[in-house]
Amino acid sequence: MKKKFLAIVTAALIGTTAFASVASAASGTIDVISREDGSGTRGAFIELFGIEEKQGDEKVDMTTEDASITNSTSVMMTTVSGDENAIGYISLGSLNDTVKAVKIDGAEASAENVANDTYKVSRPFNIVTGEKLSDAAQDFENYIMSADGQQIVEDNGYIKAADDAKAYEQSDAEGKVVVAGSSSVTPVMEKLKEAYEKVNGGKITVEVQQSDSTTGITSAAEGICDIGMASRELKDEETSENLTATEIARDGIAVVVNNDNDIDDLTSDQVKAIFTGETTEWEDLAK
């Protein structure tokens, strides 16, 4: 379900940029779709495209007040797939044929291009833990970072974090592990959970709870979950809470439009102008 986001920010003047040529553009008002405030994908997106601007001592999210807000990757995809004038952004690893990813600055959104740094719009997938991990949670983390776990990461379209990982060695731990947070990290975490539970023969069960990155980090800090999931780096105030972030994968952020939209390529400046509300009509991209 989408709703209008009423941001308490001031308008910013964005410098004139050279827009990429669009041979056959869509027409009508651009329907901007964004994620909720606690989303790690949103946090990384606004930083990478310069939508977050420094004003005094604070960083301000300049996402247009006209944007509609979705609260998960799946809802974002459903919203964009059902609206010919929509534009949004999702985890590259979650991309399927219900929406179309546009090239950014001429680079296709693909795991290969993220790995070779041709596609610049990428961010880490982190697991977040407190000072003390249960034996069961430590064993699951060991599996994620093993060669076995990292192969699952790669098989599901993400960039593995550890090229020299060693094979998983099962411990004697038993119990339950609760993992909570980012909706972008959730799909690959579900795959890791499934494979891990087969390997350990049911001695350790894993429960994955989907929310957003900020909720996952907070839950890990407060001991509500064993492991938090975040699709962004920790903020300064979060690192001071004795939390440790471990990168388990790298993922691109795909800028997506409806499959019936003729636009295939946007510049970074165009994306910024769209999401800050400077560009509001699809026809303006062809000028």
Predicted regions and their residues:
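Exported/periplasmic ABC-transporter solute-binding proteins
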Residues: 10, 19-287
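Positively charged n-region of N-terminal signal peptides that target proteins for export
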Residues: 1-10
